[in-house]
Amino acid sequence: MAKLYFRYSAMDAGKTLDLLKVAYNYEDRGRKPLVLTSAIDKRAGLNKVKSRIGIDQDAYSLTDRDNIFEFVENYNSSNKIDCVLIDEIHFFTQEQVWQLAEIVDELNIPVICYGLRTNYLGQPFETAALLLAIADTLEEVKTICHCGKKASFNMMVQNGKAIKQGNPIVVDDDSLKEIDTKYVSVCRKHWKEGVYE
């Protein structure tokens, strides 16, 4: 029986690395995973997912206007797939999350989503909130704060100061380095205090 999985964490916990490991394991056993990602995230270029340690794999980059159910149904009709793996699920829409549930329920294909639970403002991404409600299986991918506690928040740091207002979606790419901006995974206490090191 296929299931809808949501594997979530703060940044830098290894979500994409886990996705790549799962894809490898499927392929190593003669199975066919379909890897999808958001076209918003261009760090690895379009049609590719890449972990922070440098491992990458081809993928299909979709926009928030794409119908994922139709895409998977069409792809599956000519290339039988055994699993759908989605990176950066927080960049997709709630409607697309329901389409993923439809893939599980109607096509009987497992779907494993990887993404952030909250943005740097401490607010849940809409898709993450929906997945927390409807996914069959929830799995937290853990990482740690600089203090050693579990990191569950993402802090945006600009010019050495924690940012707590602005656009809730800011992609972590090379352009942020130009304006001395970075993301840091921290525990709740240090997120509230704005302490990142």
Swiss-Prot record:
The keyword Cytoplasm applies. ATP binds at S9, A10, M11, D12, A13, G14, K15, T16, D87, E88, I89, H90. Its main location: cytoplasm. One of its GO terms (biological process) is thymidine metabolic process. Zn(2+) binds at C145, C147, C187, H190. Homotetramer. Belongs to the thymidine kinase family. InterPro entries: P-loop_NTPase (IPR027417), Thymidine_kinase (IPR001267). It comes from the Bacteria. Keywords: ATP-binding, Cytoplasm, DNA synthesis, Kinase, Metal-binding, Nucleotide-binding, Transferase, Zinc. It catalyses: thymidine + ATP = dTMP + ADP + H(+). The active site is at E88. GO terms for cellular component: cytosol. This is Thymidine kinase. Its EC number is 2.7.1.21. The keyword Transferase applies. GO terms for molecular function: ATP binding; thymidine kinase activity; zinc ion binding. It is found in: Cytoplasm. It is an enzyme of class 2 (transferase).
